[in-house]
Each structure stands twice: as C-alpha cells, then as structure tokens.
Amino acid sequence: MGAGGPRRGAGPPDGGWGWVVLGACFVITGFAYGFPKAVSVFFRELKRDFGAGYSDTAWVSSIMLAMLYGTGPLSSILVTRFGCRPVMLAGGLLASAGMILASFASRLLELYLTAGVLTGLGLALNFQPSLIMLGLYFERRRPLANGLAAAGSPVFLSTLSPLGQLLGERFGWRGGFLLFGGLLLHCCACGAVMRPPPGPQPRPDPAPPGGRARHRQLLDLAVCTDRTFMVYMVTKFLMALGLFVPAILLVNYAKDAGVPDAEAAFLLSIVGFVDIVARPACGALAGLGRLRPHVPYLFSLALLANGLTDLISARARSYGTLVAFCIAFGLSYGMVGALQFEVLMATVGAPRFPSALGLVLLVEAVAVLIGPPSAGRLVDALKNYEIIFYLAGSEVVLAGVFMAVTTYCCQRCSKDIPPGPSAEGGTSDTEDVEAERDSEPMPASTEEPGSLEALEVLSPRAGSPEPEEEAVPDLSHESVGGHEAHGQNA
C-alpha cells in the first residue's frame, strides 16, 4: 500500500513502504549484531600499541554488547517519548561519533568510553526502534519479515570482519575505526526512512470524569503481569546462558582437536552461510497459516534442536564431524534468531512491544555477561571443551523444555476464558483491560496533544466525520504509541 492519506481502521500495510522499512531493519540488525564482533579484528594492533593483554582489549566488544543489551529499557523510554525516527537518527550519530572519537584515543579507557559506550548506545538506539517499526508495518507477513530482517546478522558478520581486516592492514586500526565510523552513518539513513504507517491522526487518552488525564508510564512494567511474557523472559535468560558459547569456542575447540588453523576458521563461515539461509526460510515457514498459531512451540523446537546439537557433538574430533556440527548448529541457530522476536510480538502485541523488548534485552544482557565468560574460565581451569559443550547444550535444552511445557500449561489454564479478537488467536493477560478501555467512547481530552497521554491512541470514531480541531504535533505522530490502533492488529 502506498503512503496515501489516512485511512480509518486501517491495519499494518504488509507491504508497500514496509519493504523499505524491512530493508532498513536488515541493515540495522546486521550492524547491531555484527559490529561488536567485527571490531575484534583490530585487537592484535590494539594490544601492540597500548601494551595491553587480550582480555583488556576484548573489553571494547564486551562493553559494546553490554550497552546493546543492557540499555533496552532506556531505548523503550525514548521511543515511547519521542518516537522511532528521532531516536534512530540520534543513535546513528552517536554510533558514528563513538568510532570516530575512538580513532583518536590514546588510552584504553578512552576506547572503552567511545567505541564501547557511545557506539554501543548508538547501536542500541537503532536496533530496538527498527524492530518496533517492523511490527507496525507487518502483520500477516510478519514472521517472514522477522526472518528476513534477522538474516542481516550473519550477512554483516561475514562481511564486516573481512572488511575490518582489509582496512586494518591498509590504514591501521585508527584509519579502520575512522572509516567504520563513517559506515555507521548509514544508520541515520535507515532511521530517516522509518516514517509512520498511513492511518488516523493520534489522539490522547481521555481524562476521567472530574479528574486529570491519566499519565501513562514511559516504561510499561505492567507487561510483567502477563504470564506468557514472564515465561518468555525466563526462556530467554536460560537460552542466553548457553546459546552463544559453542560459536565462541568453536575455532579453539577445532584447533585443540588437531584441525589446521585455516580449516578451523572456515568452520565459522559454514555456520554463517547456513544461518543466512535458515533465518528467512524459517520465517517463511512460521508464517504458514497452520503453523503460525504454534510459533512458541516452533521456538521451543528450535531451542531443543540447538541444545541437542551441542550435546551430541560434544565429543566430535574429526573435521568431517565438526562440519556436520556446524551445519546443524547453523540451522538451529538461524531458527532461533528468526523466531525469537516473532514470539515476543505475538505474546505481548504491538502496543506493549517497546517496553517488553527493553526488559527482555536487559535480562538477556545479564545472561550474556554470565554465560560466555564463565565458559571461558571453565575452559582455562579444566582444559576440557567437552564439559563446556555439555553444559551449554543442557542450558539451551532446558530453555526449550521450559518454554514448551509452561506455554502448554498457560494455554490449558486460560481455556475457560473466552479469547478476545486478535490476529494471534487471542489476547494476552494484560491486553484485556486495555481492550475494554479502548472500546469506550472518547470524551474530550484536557491534555496537550504532545503530552505523555498520547502514547497509546485510538482511531477516530466511525461516526465522527471531521478530525479534531487541535493540530497534533508531528512528534506525537512519529511516536510508536501513536500507532497503537494499528499495532493492536499485530
């Protein structure tokens, strides 16, 4: 659908400008997940110039990842307050400025603050809003859209690392950081295309009779009262403890098994190539009519497959067995990447997705800071990769079993409650109150159109031929909250 005038009651376009938004989301996802790993190609030069150890230089990527995950609630607040496009533009500038300033660093601390904190924060302010906009533009094709967007991670990871190696050899790490900073300005271009979907102008929440209009929280913690959301949170925590460990240790594990360096490094390329194919394919599969209502179980199946792959391959020693492990791991890893945010969108709905995503990323940040570092310490202490693979696989299997069993129990418990109309086949626990409130008539609002009460908006009543007399500022129209009426269909 084109960007025509507002249409009353229109849902997500599922196409049109949404494909441009999907392309931008593909780029942002690639930068967010690929950039912290791509920076690691400069670590050898950083160690030489600063006289530091590997663990000291590795903190640059660690801080960047911690900012990407840990600032989720901050991103949610900013998106709810200002909208997706302004936050993404600011994030692109921050990410670029961080790398440019890092190219002039004379101490490791300066690298931590610039490339780590500033660039990590900038990537976080791009990643979360891009996923939110994707949910606003796609409903029927949303699983496919999520799979295609998630494919940006392996594509950029396999591209940025060789590019960084080339830039480092030709211009040094300072020149490489400077050019990477210019490359990150593409995040601003991606943010610029994030225009709101066509639809009615936003209207603020009404004031209760005889009182002031209700102030809605910028970070909606009420989503934590939803049982299915809490199940998802626990699943993501358990998953993040072990999901990334095999990929991190794979090359060293292969070398320990006697595989030559070049062939060991190629194993990661195999994982990346399979991952690129698996993500969009899994997204298309999850979008099929008969499978889409069961996406949480597909996610559980992907986790089980990934964990069992780790357990079965823990004793792999030959190169052929390791190649088979990489193919199976890349396939299951791609399935997890394609389904993780689709499950969250289906669980909480578009109106609560910004707050829910911020909380999930914060929980995942804690797990990421526990799992891989602990695995590294165990390897140093035990000199045994087999135990680490068993431990990581067990954690991921536990996450898959927990997701499947608790989802089934939640569905059984809610069978006696008649589901409300929803694109996903029902409403979550916390959406019923909102649906009941939204069905009431809209009285005149006493608040300014740009206030926080405009975060969740309603479509104009069918019997109202003319729009409100007050002009609504563009800032509110940009806000994700300004599209709740459309996002609820997601």
UniProtKB/Swiss-Prot annotation:
The keyword Transmembrane applies. It is found in: Basolateral cell membrane. One of its GO terms (molecular function) is lactate transmembrane transporter activity. Residues 1-14, 80-85, 137-147, 194-230, 279-293, 340-352, 408-490 are cytoplasmic. Keywords: Cell membrane, Membrane, Symport, Transmembrane, Transmembrane helix, Transport. It catalyses: (S)-lactate(in) + H(+)(in) = (S)-lactate(out) + H(+)(out). Residues 426-460, 461-480 are annotated as: Basolateral sorting signal. GO terms for cellular component: apical plasma membrane; basal plasma membrane; basolateral plasma membrane; plasma membrane. It holds the Pfam family MFS_1. Residues 419-490 are annotated as: Disordered. SUPFAM superfamilies: MFS general substrate transporter. It is a multi-pass membrane protein. Residues 475-490 have a biased composition (Basic and acidic residues). Retinal pigment epithelium. The two basolateral sorting signal (BSS) are required to direct SLC16A8 to the basolateral membrane. This is Monocarboxylate transporter 3. It comes from Rattus norvegicus.
